[in-house]
Amino acid sequence: MKAKRSHQAVIMSTSLRVSPSIHGYHFDTASRKKAVGNIFENTDQESLERLFRNSGDKKAEERAKIIFAIDQDVEEKTRALMALKKRTKDKLFQFLKLRKYSIKVH
């Protein structure tokens, strides 16, 4: 029974590979979409907020406002988003520390 399971695992792992060379296809980079500077250029603020909110972001509204701020250049937006991420991370660490100490007290 074990051998059968391992055989199934081997078949499953090879069928789940995403490499085009297994199937005889090659990547054609000429037909790929070109990269854009602003990936949010064709979206509005509400749909971006909804996207962030649905992905579990607690600060979806603030993050969308930062992205759609007209008066900021790219570097300022990047710094603002990184600061928002750091604040969220710091709050998480504060929460975990408080939780750790509250467990020791009880």
UniProtKB/Swiss-Prot annotation:
Leader sequence segment: none
Variant or mutagenesis effect after changing L96R: No effect on interaction with CBY1. Accumulates at nucleoli periphery
Keyword Nucleus assigned: yes
Annotated GO biological process: apoptotic process; cellular response to heat; endothelial cell activation involved in immune response; negative regulation of apoptotic process; negative regulation of Notch signaling pathway; positive regulation of non-canonical NF-kappaB signal transduction; positive regulation of protein kinase A signaling; positive regulation of protein kinase C activity
Name of a matching Pfam family: TC1
One example GO MF annotation: Notch binding
Consequence when changing K86Q: Abolishes interaction with CBY1. Forms irregular perinuclear cytoplasmic aggregates
Keywords in alphabetical order: Apoptosis, Cytoplasm, Nucleus
Tissue: Ubiquitous. Expressed in thyroid papillary carcinoma. Expressed in liver, expression levels decrease in hepatocellular carcinoma. Slightly detected in normal lung, its expression is highly induced in lung cancer cells (at protein level).
Keyword Cytoplasm: yes
Location of this chain's protein in the cell: Cytoplasm; Nucleus, Nucleolus; Nucleus speckle; Nucleus
Any one annotated GO CC term: cytosol
Induction and repression of expression: Induced by pro-inflammatory cytokines such as TNF and IL1B, via NF-kappaB signaling. Induced by cellular stresses such as heat shock, TPA, lipopolysaccharide and UV. Induced by mitogens such as thrombin.
Top-rank taxon: Eukaryota
InterPro entries (alphabetical): Avpi1/C8orf4_dom, Tcim
Subunit structure: Monomer. Interacts with NOTCH2 (via ANK repeats), the interaction inhibits the nuclear translocation of NOTCH2 N2ICD. Interacts (C-terminus) with CBY1 (C-terminus), TCIM competes with CTNNB1 for the interaction with CBY1.
Biological role: Seems to be involved in the regulation of cell growth an differentiation, may play different and opposite roles depending on the tissue or cell type. May enhance the WNT-CTNNB1 pathway by relieving antagonistic activity of CBY1. Enhances the proliferation of follicular dendritic cells. Plays a role in the mitogen-activated MAPK2/3 signaling pathway, positively regulates G1-to-S-phase transition of the cell cycle. In endothelial cells, enhances key inflammatory mediators and inflammatory response through the modulation of NF-kappaB transcriptional regulatory activity.
Protein's name in the database: Transcriptional and immune response regulator
Lineage, highest ranks first: Eukaryota, Metazoa, Chordata, Craniata, Vertebrata
Gene designation per UniProt: TCIM
